[in-house]
Every structure is written in structure tokens, then in C-alpha cells.
Amino acid sequence: MQTITRTSRNSLASLTLGAIGVVYGDIGTSPLYAFREALGQAARDGIVQAEIVGVLSLALWALIIVVTLKYVIFLSRMDNNGEGGVLSLMALAQRATGGGWVAVTLLGATGAALFYGDAIITPALSVLSAAEGLKTIPGLDGMSQTAIIGVTVGILAALFMFQSRGTASVATLFGPVCLVWFVALAGLGLWHIADAPEVLTAFNPLHAVTFLVSHGVTGLFVLGAVFLTVTGAEALIADMGHFGRRPIQLGWLSFVWPALTLNYLGQGALALKALAAAEAIGQPLANADWFFIMAPDVLRAPLVILATLATIIASQAVITGAYSLTHQAISLGLLPRLTIRQTSEHQMGQIYMPGVNWLLLGGVLLLVLGFKSSSAMAAAYGIAVTGTMVVTTCMAFLIAWKYWNWEPVWTALLIAPFLALDLFFFGANILRVSEGGWVPLLVAGLVGLVIFTWLKGRRTALARASEQGVSLNETVMALHARPPTRIEGTAVFLTQDLDVTPSALLHNLKHNKALHRNNIVLKVEIQARPYVAPEQRVVVDRIDESFLKARLRYGYMDTIDVPSDLARADGLLVGPGGTSFFVGRSAIRFAARPVLPRWMTVVYMFLHRNAADPTAYFSIPSNRVVELGSQIEL
């Protein structure tokens, strides 16, 4: 019993350390810029003590309400068979509502689109903020911003180019490095709190309320900047499938939250001390890079190096999250198939998506070169994250109501304060659209357009194919009446509709005048759950002695391997002659009477034409595939 308990504790400690290295990388690097930017918004007419304490109070209570209460305590319980994140919640809400609510799909698509807007900003802002710390090192204070940008571009380019090799070999370092990072955050904070203990009054929420009331519109701009302290909170639920609820909660409550709180208090204490010194000589206090100047000169260079490593790890977590979200979106039918490569033979889920990788790199570098400083870029950050949080909260209401069967009134009373706060933050960030907030909105809009076009185009194409198709039962009856030449072996015809004869089967009969001894009409179905148990994978319905219909069911996080799963199903792939897979490849053409707007058809044609090969996506060896073409007019 003691051995089991000890093993369980070791496993919990290991998972908690892993969560600290992956889940909290984004929110853990916020002290680099969050307090500085929030105070900068408040200090347009000079900094006073009430503004320092007020901004700090807003930051502390944002961590308490948004991260601790909403995400760690409430939303972490809302998982889809252990998986979290906006698309997992969408899939769970679809199951809860029977899949018939279009609003659920729209919410999920909106959340996913906003995530990509956030994904290009996080690496750019965090790495650039760390690189700007170089100017605080004695002797490097004259370093130009152009040189800082060059260093940032070099680090980011190297990071994205490294992705194709996978991160399994270095991932074990993420936890220890971030552990040191959070210890440094806490240590620096404690050191400065002792110089101005009155900073602890910021725990009184009246300071936050008074600040907002007294500063009017300026208070809303400050609130938008304060939100930078909680960016990255979505990762707490998005990574539940990797680490589990308890390690994530334990890591936050016992380590990360205290470290962040102490560091923000330390930055506030340093600002109060600097304010007292400035007032003593009759000078106004200018805003500063409070995080880096917390460290003494001799430790400034090591702190910059540590901050750079922490931001690289945070960026890696966002990149990996983008791969994972894209994989889920493809499985759930929101995006066309993209090339996916496994980067580890031993660890599931270690994937690399070259298309996503290079698009992210292009966006990240454009941001760095366009905004040129972390302060300018910070205005663009919050709007995508707040939008995602609004979507998540709305999804939480649907799940609590429809899936947990809570009373709608009580559910609304619980969710309403969280939604009100999310909308308040969202409104505060909307004010900064002209300062750069338009960038993530533009990215989200483009991704949303792709998702909407793919959903609409694919649904329309499937409907047209069904209209033009022939009933499978009628085809089987016709083959009984006029039997073609039989050849040994098994033919597997992939289809989207089991009631319609696959076009590949019709073309095979037309051109080859032959039919295999055994024929399987197969549909691959993606369930609204992350995983499907192997024993529930295959569902078979026999039509006659030579034809059967089969469903292969996968979760949206499962790795699809059609040949292996068919081979494991008793009695499917039998007899001599081997197995051939017939895939219909449809070409989209303009119809004489179009059913979609022309621009949408053009975009859908582009997406359809550039989608990854379905045989690779289904793990079917190319030497066992026969492709037969058809045309669909839209």
C-alpha cells in the first residue's frame, strides 16, 4: 500500500511539473509586460500612488476571479472524456444538444478562429518582451531597437524551423526551466515587497473599484491592459487531456498563482519606492520596464536569459496547441485535411503540421517587423483572448444546462457573473482596435471565412453527390440480375453516405467490368468525443454474401488507421487476393445554375483541391489504393 501511495505521489508530482512547463508558460511570462502596460495606460498624465495600487488591485483580482474561480475551480470540471479546450467543449455541447443546434457549431468555429488570432501574437509579444530586457543590462543600454528586433526574429525563426524535428527530446526540460522561472518570479517579488509593504493593500478590491470609477474611459483602457495578466488561462482547460485536472489545479494553486501574485506585488512595490524617490526631488515618475529592473545589475543578464527560455517554452506550447486544435478541427469537419506528420515513434500526439507551422511563422514575423516593440504589440493581444473566453463561457452554460441537467435559472445565475466579466474585458479591449486590436480580428475573420466556406461547401457538395447518386441497395439488386466477372480479393470503397453507391464502385464496374469477391462499403465517422474504445470501433451491416456496409468510428483525438482497424475486425478482410482500397476523388466544377455564391465556390474549390491526400490521412498504403475520379457541380 505504501509503495502504491508513493508511486501515485511521484506520478502526481511528475505531471504537476510537466503542467508547470507547458500549461502555464503563456500566463507565466505575462509579468514581463502586463504591469508595465497597464500602468502605462493609467499614467498618461503622471503616475500617483492610487494608480499604482489600483492597477495592482485589478491585476490581483483578475487572477483570482478569471483564472482561479472560473478556470481552475469551475471550467476544469467541464471536460469531454478528459479533454478540454474550445473544440472539445463544442463537441460536448453538440452531444448534449443532440447535434442539431447550429449555434453550437458557430460558437466553436468562432472560438477556434479567435485562437489563431491569439496564436500569432503570443510568440511575437513574449519573445520580443524578453529580448527588450537586453537594454536593461549594464553596458547594453544603448542597444538599438533594430538590433532587438533582429535578435527576436532570429530566435523565432529558429524555433519554428526546429518544429519538424519534434520536441520530445527537449520537452523534459520545459518543467524544470519553468520551475526555476517561477521561483525567480516569487523571489524577486518578495525582495521588493519588503521595501514597500503598503503594497499589500492592493488585495482590498475597493482599490480596483475606486480606480475604475474615478478614471472613466481611461479606466477601461487600463482594464484592457490588465487583462494581459490572465492571457493564457485557456491553456488550463485545453491541456487537461495531457496532464489531468488535479495536476493542473495543484500546479496553479500551490505554485504558479502564488509566484505570479508575489511578482506583481513586487513590481508594484518597486514602483511605489520609485515614486517616493521621484516625489522627494520634485520630479514626476516615468513608467519603466519594472520587471527587469527588479533584478540587481549583476543578475540582469541571467534574468534576461531565463526570461528568453521561458518565452520560448511559452511559444512552443502555443505552437503545439495550434497543431492540436487544427487536428481537432479537421476531425470535426471544420477544416480541410492538412498534412500531419508524427514526430515521435513512442509518444502519441507528437505531431507536426508544416502548413500551420509556416503560416504561423509568417504571421509572427510580420507582427514583430510591423509593431517593432512589445508595448505597441500589447494593444493587439487581449481582444482575441477575451473573445475566446466569451465563447467558452457561453459553451459552459449549454453544457451545464443540457449535459449536467442543471436547472436553467440556476445555471444562468452562476454563469452570468463570469459572462458579464468576460464581456466587460472584451469591451475594454474593443476600445483598442485602432491601436492594433484589428490584427487578431483580421486573422480570426480570415480563419472564420475558411471554416464557414468549408462547412457550407462540403455540406452542399455531399448533398449534390447524394442527389446524383444511385441507391446502394438498387445497385446490389442489379448486380444479382446481371452478375459481372468476379475476381478474388476484397475491395473497400470509401464513402460519405452508406445508402448511396460510391462513385468509385460505379466507375470500377463501368471501366473494368469486374467485381471483387468481397466488397466493403466503408464510412469513417468522427464522433463528438475524443476517443472511441477499440471494441466499439467497427459496426457492420451485411447486405448479402458479397456486400456489406461498415462504419469505422473514431474520436476527434484518435489516430486514424483504416487498414489496421479493419484487419482487427473479425471476418472482414478474409479470403485470397488481398485487399484494395477504392477512393473516389471528385473535381468541383461551376454549375450552369450555381447553388453557392461564386466567390464561395472559388474558395471551396481552392480548399478542396489543396486538401491533403485522404489515403495518407486514413493511413492507407499508396500501393493498395485505386483512385477513380468524378465531378460535382456547385
UniProtKB/Swiss-Prot annotation:
Belongs to the HAK/KUP transporter (TC 2.A.72) family. InterPro entries: K+_transporter, K_trans_C, K_trans_N, Kup. This is Probable potassium transport system protein Kup 2. The gene is kup2. Its main location: membrane. It is found in: Cell inner membrane. It holds the Pfam family K_trans. It catalyses: K(+)(in) + H(+)(in) = K(+)(out) + H(+)(out). It comes from the Bacteria. One of its GO terms (molecular function) is symporter activity. The chain crosses the membrane at residues 15-35, 55-75, 101-121, 142-162, 173-193, 208-228, 252-272, 303-323, 351-371, 381-401, 408-428, 435-455. It comes from Novosphingobium aromaticivorans (strain ATCC 700278 / DSM 12444 / CCUG 56034 / CIP 105152 / NBRC 16084 / F199). Transport of potassium into the cell. Likely operates as a K(+):H(+) symporter. Keywords: Cell inner membrane, Cell membrane, Ion transport, Membrane, Potassium, Potassium transport, Symport, Transmembrane, Transmembrane helix, Transport. It is a multi-pass membrane protein. GO terms for cellular component: plasma membrane.
